[in-house]
Swiss-Prot record:
It catalyses: [phosphate](n) + ATP = [phosphate](n+1) + ADP. One of its GO terms (molecular function) is polyphosphate kinase activity. Mg(2+) binds at residues 422, 452. Residues 25-42 have a biased composition (Low complexity). Residues 1-46 are annotated as: Disordered. Belongs to the polyphosphate kinase 1 (PPK1) family. GO terms for cellular component: polyphosphate kinase complex. GO terms for biological process: polyphosphate biosynthetic process. The active site is at residue 482. An intermediate of this reaction is the autophosphorylated ppk in which a phosphate is covalently linked to a histidine residue through a N-P bond. Disulfide bonds: none annotated. This is Polyphosphate kinase. The keyword Kinase applies. It comes from Mycolicibacterium gilvum (strain PYR-GCK).
């Protein structure tokens, strides 16, 4: 499993930057909108100033929920180790982006306060306090629970002191042949300045003593990141089936005298630094965007430090030296008992012990597309009606991937246009687009090369597509293209028909097995016309005046959603049963939150299911007492965005979260789902999430998340229930 598969998309950089917006409009800007309802009357009760929760602390609460899964003894053991790794990777990215952005604003003297009234410095202080708590909890869940449980199951992480002489002799051979040649001990003295320490690298800080004059010097060794973190030991004859691992830093520490011959090793400690990765490309209309991005990627390596993790046995003098030389503030130090960088537990997760993992699940193929062994033409199926796919319960490879591959191979297909935000290393989607271009089809790929931490991969794919003859567009100046859309143009007799896919998740077959997402496959003429207009806006200079069934950011998603909330309010006041159900990764945008508060005041029942950040404060009498907020975490990463307005009877799916970055600085697409067969599927998802027995966390008005159901009550798992439905429809 790759890092990209575990990414939980915690954040982007500063939310305050302005975007240069290209000519894209949406349904909210146009006449053919659904008929507006009467304006909702003014609310008598004003909204209080303290109505928002802090987004940064809310994100840390999200990661604490991930940690709660790692601590849950009812989960398979290696899945618990996986959640420890995910927690660590998440926290790394949070510091690289969110904390880095706050530090920059604080250092520049920018006094802009967060929506809940905190200055950057106040937020940094609270983040530090909260991080110390959950980082300590993270380490102890591993040390006191998961590591001993792994040992009981025959997966043992040992120390050097636990090895016998024969094992040490074998490891000595391994060290000298495989590890020693790639190590570079770096001493610090007047002739050797303090070495550059790359971000997220694991290092040993060492004090050596010269026997002649007793002089002590600091040295640093980087633990190589191109070898396994854990060295697997040969099996013992007296312990069949037991797998044992030694951390690489322990192996290196055991042979420091080989690296520093003739010197006394006084002390050694592990440390790890996190650097600022919150860089924005300075986009100039007169400069090649690809060149600008590559220049920025080179700078990212040298970002300023934002966190220093050290082993908790590090001496005060060693810590002071690191703080001084790395220019790290004492408040940015995290002392860790035990191993640093538990993201490397992915290696332990890969041990072949299926009994310690979730049982395998084979995704289904929607009946409209035939059986896996006897597939039906996607095009003929879509002519019969729209199809809603729900990954990973519905197979990505036999639905969306097959749609694109069939389009590439079909001689009647004239053109394929697609957005690509993140895709897999060996992408069948990209290969299909290349095949289509080489077969003479018109192929357009909008590759978002600014997708954070996937920039290099996307640059590689963009160049491969260009070499095959694909028309590649490298995103838009000032915006990220985050929408998930594909348009296929096909000749059928004397007519042209357009087939479309609009989704909530990336065109990535690997993450599609791990991320929960929704996709709409349709041959509806109005959606085909909408996507044609959208791609013309993305690739050219046209300005679309109206969309029929889409809301498109950066102009129309927020406006369209708030308009529909207002219509729901008006319908409720006219006697309808008002209800808004919203599923998203994050709910931060103040304008959307305030609209939901107004809905609650008007008697509309609001049910929010959010995976991560939530700045809305539910359950407060007078303004949010009709709002509930739940969070569901589990085997799959909840990633779909769905909205249902009951009184006005509208369902929408799409790529946009309710965040400033999505609504103001990205191209996002939300599509209306109209077919009652498909809206029933969406209702089933909401009903399952809202079931009182569903394992989840519920947000209180004080910002505290409570695990539900309470002990002693019947429990069901939302994701397992959806898997069972696919097995037994």
């Amino acid at each position: 499993m790759t890092e990209a598969q575990t990414r939980t998309e915690p954040s982007e950089s500063s939310e305050s930057s302005e975007a240069v917006a290209p000519a894209i409009t949406s349904a909210a800007d146009s006449a053919p909108e659904a008929p507006p309802a009467t304006t909702a009357p003014a609310i008598e009760n004003p909204l209080p100033e303290d109505r928002y929760l802090n987004r940064e602390l809310s994100w840390l609460d999200f990661n604490a929920r991930v940690l709660a899964l790692a601590a849950d003894p009812s989960l398979p053991l290696l899945e618990r180790a996986k959640f420890l790794a995910i927690f660590a990777s998440n926290l790394d990215e949070f510091y690289m982006v969110r904390v880095a952005g706050l530090k920059r604003r604080d250092e520049m003297g920018l006094s802009v306060r967060s929506a809940d009234g905190l200055s950057p410095r106040e937020q940094l202080r609270r983040i530090s306090e909260r991080t110390q708590q959950i980082a300590s909890r993270h380490a102890h869940v591993f040390l006191d629970s998961v590591r001993p449980a792994l040992a009981d199951e025959g997966i043992v992480i040992v120390t050097w002191a636990q090895l016998d002489d024969a094992e040490r002799a074998k490891l000595s051979t391994y060290f000298h042949e495989q590890v020693f040649p790639v190590l570079t001990p770096l001493a610090v003295d007047p002739a050797h300045p303090f070495p550059f320490v790359s971000g997220l690298s694991l290092n040993l800080a060492i004090t050596v003593k010269h026997p002649d004059d007793g002089g002590q010097h600091f040295a640093r060794i980087k633990v190589p990141d191109n070898v396994d973190r854990f060295v697997e030991l040969p099996a013992r004859g007296d312990s069949p089936g037991v797998v044992r691992f030694l951390p690489m830093e322990e192996l290196i520490a055991a042979f420091l005298t080989v690296l520093f011959p003739g010197l006394e090793i006084v002390e050694h400690h592990a440390f790890r630094i996190t650097r600022n990765a919150d860089f924005e490309v300075e986009e100039d209309r007169d400069e090649d965007l690809l060149q600008a991005l590559e220049r920025e990627l080179a700078r990212r390596r040298f970002g300023s430090p934002v966190r220093l993790e050290v082993s908790d046995d590090m001496t005060e003098s060693m810590l002071e030296l690191l703080l001084r030389e790395l220019d790290v503030a004492p408040g940015d130090v995290v002392e860790v008992p035990g191993l640093l960088d538990l993201s490397s537990l992915w290696q332990i997760y890969s041990v072949d012990r299926p009994g310690l993992k979730d049982p395998p699940f084979v995704p289904a193929t929607p009946s409209a597309f035939g059986e896996r062994e006897t597939p039906k033409s996607i095009f003929s199926a879509l002519r019969d009606g729209d199809v809603l796919v729900h990954h990973p319960y519905d197979s990505f490879s036999t639905t969306v991937q097959r749609f694109i591959e069939q389009a590439a191979a079909d001689p009647n297909v004239l053109a394929i246009k697609q957005t690509l935000y993140r895709t897999s290393g060996d992408s069948p989607i990209v290969n299909a687009l290349i095949d289509a271009a080489e077969a003479g089809k018109q192929v357009v790929a909008l590759v978002e090369i600014k997708a954070r931490f996937d920039e290099q991969a996307n640059i590689k794919w963009a160049r491969a597509l260009e070499q095959a003859g694909v028309h590649v567009v490298y995103g838009l100046i000032g915006l990220k293209t985050h929408c998930k859309t594909c348009l296929v143009v096909r000749r059928e007799g004397s007519t042209i028909r357009r087939y479309c896919h609009i989704g909530t998740g990336n065109y990535n077959p690997k993450t599609a097995r791990l991320y929960e997402d929704i996709g709409l496959l349709t041959a509806a003429p109005d959606i085909g016309a909408d996507l044609t207009d959208l791609f013309n806006s993305l690739t050219g200079y046209s300005r679309k005046e109206s969309y029929r069934n889409l809301l498109v950011a950066p102009y129309g998603v927020r406006r369209g959603i708030i308009e529909r909330i207002d219509r729901e309010i008006a319908a409720t006041r006219d006697g309808a049963e008002g209800r808004i159900r919203l599923k998203a990764n994050a709910l931060v945008d103040e304008q959307v939150i305030d609209a939901l508060y107004r809905a609650s005041q008007a008697g509309v029942q609001v049910e929010v299911v959010v995976r991560g950040i939530c700045a809305l404060r539910p359950g407060e009498p007078g303004f949010s007492d009709n709002i509930t907020v739940r969070s569901i975490l589990g085997r799959f990463l909840e990633h779909s965005r769905i909205i249902h307005f009951r009184a006005i009877d509208e369902y929408w799916i799409g790529s946009a979260d309710m965040m400033h970055r999505n609504l103001d600085r990205r191209v996002e697409v939300m599509a209306q789902v109209k077919d009652p067969r498909l809206t029933t599927q969406l209702n089933d998802i909401f009903d399952s999430a809202a079931d009182p027995r569903t394992r989840c966390w519920e947000l209180g008005s004080d910002g505290h998340w409570t695990a539900l159901p309470q002990e002693g009550h019947s429990v069901r798992d939302h994701q397992i229930s959806l898997m069972e439905r696919r097995r037994h429809p």
